[in-house]
Amino acid sequence: MTQYNALKAEYPEALLLFRVGDFYETFGEDAVSTAKALDIVLTKRSNGAAADMPLAGFPHHALDAYMPRLVKAGFKVAICEQLEDPKSVKGIVKRGVTEVVTPGIAHHETLLSARSNNFLAALHADGPLIGLALVDVSTGEFFAAEGPLGEIDPWMQSFKPSEVVFNRRAGRDDLRALMGSAVPSGLEDWVFAREFASRTLSDHFGTASLKGFGLDDAPLAVVAAGALLHYLRQAQYAKWDHIERIQRLRPATHLWMDRFTVRNLELFGSAHPGGVGLIDVLDATANPMGARLLRRWLAMPLLDPQALGRRHDAVAWALAHPEPAGRAAAVLGELPDLERTATRLATGRTGPRDLRALAHAVARINELASELNGASPLEHLLEALDPLEAWCADIDATLASDPPVLLAKGGAIAAGVDPELDRYRLLKRDARSVLEGILQAESERSGIPSL
């Protein structure tokens, strides 16, 4: 148990799923919580002490079924894998935590709503001002804000984070109140040092300063954002290059509504039995990306007259041109969730099939953009598109027409791309014919007919 106890000490707030052979095991209080949450058998293991240690586990192939249930129950889950082949090691197998899954750090489809974001937040206060940072690791969206409680509370209501990172030594009741039903995650106070936060952000974005992001006059927002990125690192979330920028939230650009206004307007739900929220009435979007965007628009109405005008002009164009607008809706309805698909690819959580689907989607978007060319209210959207023609051509030429979900399954690369790969495939598929060919060639070369 020495190895287990050492790893558990590194992740005291998480349920540690400890890989033992073909099972994930939990011990002690973790086992009690796991057995209760998953409704599995709780047993005991003799540890040589006066009392036996509680034990609960499940087969490793059931991880995708059980892990989301633990996270939905409000637990943080640390997944500990065997880092060596047990058959090749004498003694204790080396183990390590490879991933931490929390309510705010989730990629598993059963933990995410396709039509709404899943934000992880961080809060940091100094006097009357509060810094806020929000990231959705499944889409790469990253926001930061700074202001008094009256400004931060509406942002928290609009984004509704599922988990909030905070300074566990701060002791601020107002921050606790802001968290609402979100899962709290406390970090040590050194994580919230401004110099550390600035360096963390600058290193991530590869910039000398944060002025280009509009954060040079928002030190508390910088601290919150830096703490958020540190938390991702701590959770073994090593691949996060898809988080490419951070956007400053400002009260002058949007109408921010407090929790009472949102509730009374019934924007996202109804207090009446059988009732629905305004979002359910308005949402006729063609795909999950549109649904998440509409939810954002409803939670954060625009105040900028020019931005409002552009949006209204685009809607007016669609109403006046039903045929191209209808075809556009049909194409958008065909698309996969591009934001989350791209994130899975960037973080190494998917494979060739998603990559080909992404390339096909980009090609369809390019076709749609060509068809909509000349629609002046949409020009600002069309001009922002990168056709990625060379990338699409490479994917089309390299990947098989129906590649596997995972690269390890084989068959991802199309025939003719790599002669050596084609030769190995032929050997695997028809070794006898290859050997007969070699035999025939050697017989002809040597003049010996019966090799």
Q: Which role fits each region the language model picked out?
A:
Residues 1-317, 330-346, 350-440:
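Charged catalytic and DNA/RNA-contacting regions of genome-maintenance
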Residues 319-325:
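Conserved interaction-surface patches within small, structured recognition/assembly domains
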Residues 442-451:
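Glycine/charge-rich, flexible interdomain linkers and switch-proximal surface loops
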